[in-house]
Amino acid sequence: MPNPLYRQHIISISDLSREQLECLLQTALKLKAHPRGDLLEGKLIGSCFFEPSTRTRLSFETAVQRLGGKVIGFSDGANTSAKKGETLADTARIISGYTDAIIQRHPKDGAARVAAEFSRVPVINAGDGTNQHPSQTLLDLVTIYETQGRLDKLKIAMAGDLKYGRTVHSLCQALKRWGCEFAFVSPPSLAMPDYITEELDEAGCRYRILGSLEEAAEWADILYMTRVQRERFDEQEFAKIQGKFNLDASMLARAKPNLRVLHPLPRVDEIHPDVDATPHAYYFEQATNGVYARMAILSLVLNEEV
């Protein structure tokens, strides 16, 4: 079967068809079961992180090395010519002359598409502002499939910061292709953006607003937690909402046996450590799947056949 992702930029989940997502998913599962160390042999990958990252940067760089490739790059935009005023377009032009692909994280929405416009090699978006995080979405899909045995018509609850959380935006855009049903739990000021709910309406996917994490845990197959960021509230308002969106083990008492709790990490207070010991916790395994998801992206973008 032809590889539908060869030499393609990976910028946004909305750019990818269900066929392409399924190809990525199955390749990630295949590489997890049967690792290969030759798929990036002779390839040099640019790792360009203009803002801090732990899991995304290290898992991408791990993926490159496990596939037999090499990495050059930076982990802080302050140490690059961007500090001198070089445009992102020029940076992309230059680095694409050195490398076979560029992995980029940037604080500005839309930065990945700018880089892709001027790069001579594929650009993989490792997060651009509050916009998109497609490689996180792929590892989420791998994890959901791994725990549920399917993606079709699952019940997906999302909690916390749904307005600024790029992970939940991308995940909704992916899972709508499988006819999933959604539930949202958040402060009103951090509700899921209208453009996402409009996309769900257009896809015929039902969604509901729930008032508590207990309701979400009882209803869902997947409970996807995100961090409510203190810096978006004054202290008094934050104190009112903080505990309401923190999950502890007691809230899972009526959960279905197949429920799995996911989180893009890092967590702060929104998942109590007592959840870690429950059979529902799966966020550390989710993070591990990041390596295999990113191995799949790199392998497919840089090889005609995998």
UniProtKB/Swiss-Prot annotation:
* GO BP annotations, alphabetical order: 'de novo' pyrimidine nucleobase biosynthetic process; 'de novo' UMP biosynthetic process; amino acid metabolic process
Gene3D superfamilies registered for this protein in UniProt: Aspartate/ornithine carbamoyltransferase
**Cellular component terms per the entry's GO annotation:** cytosol
Give the catalytic activity. Answer: carbamoyl phosphate + L-aspartate = N-carbamoyl-L-aspartate + phosphate + H(+)
Q: In which pathway does it act?
A: Pyrimidine metabolism; UMP biosynthesis via de novo pathway; (S)-dihydroorotate from bicarbonate: step 2/3
Per UniProt, L-aspartate binds at: K84, R166, R227
Alphabetically sorted, this entry's keywords are: Pyrimidine biosynthesis, Transferase
**So where does carbamoyl phosphate get bound?**
R55, T56, R105, H133, Q136, L265, P266
User: What's its EC?
Assistant: 2.1.3.2
Q: Which GO terms describe its molecular function?
A: amino acid binding; aspartate carbamoyltransferase activity
Q: What does this protein do?
A: Catalyzes the condensation of carbamoyl phosphate and aspartate to form carbamoyl aspartate and inorganic phosphate, the committed step in the de novo pyrimidine nucleotide biosynthesis pathway.
- HAMAP family for the chain: Asp_carb_tr (MF_00001)
- Can you tell me which family this protein belongs to? Belongs to the aspartate/ornithine carbamoyltransferase superfamily. ATCase family.
Q: How does it assemble?
A: Heterododecamer (2C3:3R2) of six catalytic PyrB chains organized as two trimers (C3), and six regulatory PyrI chains organized as three dimers (R2).
Protein name, UniProt field: Aspartate carbamoyltransferase catalytic subunit
Species, as recorded? Neisseria meningitidis serogroup C / serotype 2a (strain ATCC 700532 / DSM 15464 / FAM18)
